[in-house]
């Protein structure tokens, strides 16, 4: 088990710099034999301010190298107050980044670009904005997403329409320079909400003639909310949903995911931003805020179900097998399964007692008063995660969260889960592709250990296998690009 760092909550196998603020993943692209992951980053402080594009790259999704800051605000320029979110493409031997240029006092963030001919180390910004003005009847405008389809370049831009609906606006181009606005690619329903909603960070994945549109719901009053996925088909420049929208992630701490089209045919990868779930004062003491999720594979089943699973490459991070237990429990007292590290990968099959709940408890204090509970509830047909006792520090946020699990309602049906825990983040995946992401902040003494528990009069059964994860493949050095030095301000 690797020696924990000074900060026991800093993730070991999730991407983020060693300190300071990060938020949205950006510019996911495979270029020159590497996966490139950019992200919103304040290199100088812990606030969402002075936003740059940070940069990691990897040849294999296992070994990561942090590169110098890619994009920095230009003092006095169109992006003086932040290089906000967007994406990147690999074209003609170069990286071309599309991003939102932020200036205080301008309600929209125009689309602009920067290009790199050396794999993302040095960047040249275009001298003027690519799309300087938003269309009429919009009240929010940011976050371009560009892809190539049928020989044409296409762009979605996140927006809010004047009538209160969120929308992804469509543009098209033959040359990446001249873009024609085609109107809303897709928009929300007025009946879905009484409050105005904007769609941030639209992403679009194609699976044959079917499409998956991912949007991040944002409200003027509360800001970032949650991520919604729409499935359907495109017809004459408009996306037609074939099913009601659903949440992409059922946890409280997941937002603004970004897609990467992998070099393999039909394979899509996704990273999200997992924000802090603790008081700002604690994050400021720690010196960092936010992390990216693990890379996930995004799939679309024949029945239209969107699924997510950890990228297959992550199996290579597994090191020592920590435990392998099988059994049934019919007593109110939990069964001790064994110790785990603070960064581990677990697979389990749970067959719940149909008259109660059956699950696992991650105990993080010697006296057992600090724990994270994960339970199957057959009556509700849901998987529930309770972090109400997951930290003895009152500055950590509590809450109970769940995701649908219809199989739990069928007596005797085993339910397969995969749980990846990395110090202060848990990603919980059903084998059917639903996922719940949350943050928690244990402070208890003693080793972490797992228990199995069941609440009904019958028996709940389990098989659990867990491995320590080796973080040795992430090389993080706090590097700054030269162009960022002249914008060094206290934030």
Summary of predicted features, one role per range:
Residues 231-255, 260-491:
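Beta-rich accessory regions
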Residues 1-26, 45-48, 62-90, 120-148, ...:
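Surface loop/turn signatures of beta-propeller and other carbohydrate-active proteins
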Residues 14, 36, 55:
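Histidine-centered active-site/metal-ligand motif
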Residues 52-60, 110-119, 168-176, 226-236, ...:
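Beta-propeller blade signature
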Residues 54-55, 86-87, 144, 170, ...:
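Hydrophobic/aromatic beta-strand elements that line small-molecule binding cavities or substrate pockets
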Residues 24-44, 48, 68-69, 84-106, ...:
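Hydrophobic core segments of beta-strands in well-ordered, beta-rich domains
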Residues 40, 58, 100, 114-116, ...:
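Predominantly extracellular/luminal cell-surface or secreted proteins
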Residues 21, 48-51, 81, 106, ...:
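Active-site-proximal structural scaffolding
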């Amino acid at each position: 088990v690797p020696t924990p760092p000074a900060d026991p909550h800093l993730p070991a196998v999730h991407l983020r710099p060693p300190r300071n603020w990060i938020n949205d993943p950006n510019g996911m692209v495979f270029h020159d034999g590497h996966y490139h992951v950019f992200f919103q980053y304040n290199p100088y402080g812990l606030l969402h301010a002075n936003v740059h594009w940070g940069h990691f790259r990897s040849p294999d999704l296992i070994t990561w190298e942090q590169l110098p800051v890619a994009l920095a605000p230009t003092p006095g320029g169109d992006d003086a107050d932040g290089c906000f979110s967007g994406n990147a493409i690999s074209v003609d031997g170069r990286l071309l980044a599309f991003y939102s240029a932020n200036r205080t006092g301008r309600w929209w963030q125009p689309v602009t670009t920067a290009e790199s001919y050396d794999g993302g180390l040095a960047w040249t910004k275009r001298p003027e904005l690519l799309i300087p003005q938003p269309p009429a009847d919009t009240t929010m405008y940011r976050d371009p997403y560009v892809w190539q389809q049928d020989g044409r370049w296409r762009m979605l831009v996140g927006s809010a329409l004047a009538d209160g609906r969120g929308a992804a606006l469509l543009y098209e181009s033959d040359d990446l320079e001249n873009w024609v606005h085609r109107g809303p690619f897709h928009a929300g329903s007025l009946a879905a909400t009484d409050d105005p909603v904007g769609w941030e960070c639209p992403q679009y994945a194609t699976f044959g003639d079917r499409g998956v549109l991912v949007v991040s719901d944002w409200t003027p009053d509360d800001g970032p909310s949650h991520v919604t996925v729409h499935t359907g088909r495109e017809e004459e420049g408009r996306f037609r949903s074939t099913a009601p929208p659903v949440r992409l992630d059922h946890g409280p701490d997941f937002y603004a995911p970004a897609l990467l089209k992998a070099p393999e045919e039909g394979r899509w990868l996704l990273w999200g931003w997992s924000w802090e779930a603790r008081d700002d004062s604690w994050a400021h003491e720690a010196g960092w805020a936010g992390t990216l999720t693990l890379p996930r594979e995004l799939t679309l089943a024949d029945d239209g179900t969107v699924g997510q699973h950890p990228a297959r490459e992550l199996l290579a991070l597994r090191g020592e097998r920590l435990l392998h237990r099988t059994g049934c429990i019919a007593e109110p007292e939990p069964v001790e399964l064994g110790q785990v590290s603070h960064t581990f990968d677990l697979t389990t099959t749970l067959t719940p007692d149909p008259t109660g709940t059956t699950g696992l408890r991650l105990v993080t204090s010697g006296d057992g008063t600090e724990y994270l509970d994960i339970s199957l509830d057959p009556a509700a047909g849901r998987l529930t995660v309770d972090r109400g006792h997951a930290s003895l520090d009152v500055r950590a946020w509590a809450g109970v969260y769940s995701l649908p699990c219809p199989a739990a309602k069928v007596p005797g049906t085993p339910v397969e889960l995969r749980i990846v825990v990395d110090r202060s983040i848990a990603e919980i995946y059903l084998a059917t592709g639903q996922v719940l992401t949350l943050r928690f902040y244990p402070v208890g003494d003693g080793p972490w250990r797992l228990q199995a528990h069941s609440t009904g009069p019958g028996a709940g059964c389990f098989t659990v296998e867990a491995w320590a994860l080796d973080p040795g493949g992430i090389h993080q050095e706090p590097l700054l690009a030269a162009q960022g030095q002249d914008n060094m301000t206290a934030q």
